[in-house]
Amino acid sequence: MAAYGRILKTVTEASDEILQIAYVRGLCIGTAAAIASAFDFVVAKADAPFYVTSAELGGHSAEAGAWCFKGDQDASLGYIRSLLDFIPDTTVDHETSDDLNRLLTELPLSADIRASLTAIVDDGALIEVYADYGTPIVTAFASVGGIKCGVVAGNYTEDHGRITRDAAYKTAEFLDICDSFGLPVVTLVNSDGLAADIPMDAVRSLFCLCTTRCPRRDRHSRSCHRCRLYITRFQEPR
């Protein structure tokens, strides 16, 4: 147990300083799963058991948003390589043939927001994290004008973009990672506010939007109601 404690302490101390990606390719349960969950990203092989406590006891990882991607071995390793392409200190900004000031003739804002994001970012390339968790919000890494950035977007096709508990925690976690590694964040707001059953601790987690130090740009793309409007306004002009 002391060794487990030392490992977890080392992982925690490295947080915000070193990019940490855990790849779960086999059985990972109990304390090992807890340590993996402390990494910045967890990528899991589709058939790999991954939980702190068993599903029968309510500890199934699918309910906790424990991984940012799950697929077969080739897809998982490809996803990890793509992540490394977007995190500073593991990559550099690159030249793009897409003009930053190009005219976007049509953005399908009423459709899945991913279509709009593909039109906005360089070369239509982005890598989504936690795609199956907190689905009213889309979080992804991309490049705009050759500059690597994080993207947070309301997905209006999922309950009119109303922010749920999972979506709030997902947003807070993603923004913390962007802030840690100095990635600017582009926010596309398209939300009818908060879900009726969202707990207060999840609402509080959203106020990380107010405390992030990384550059941010917010764009109200369609709908911006109530608390969501206030949160996006709590930032210093840049």
Language model region names:
Residues 1-238:
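Ligand-binding clefts of soluble mixed alpha/beta catalytic domains
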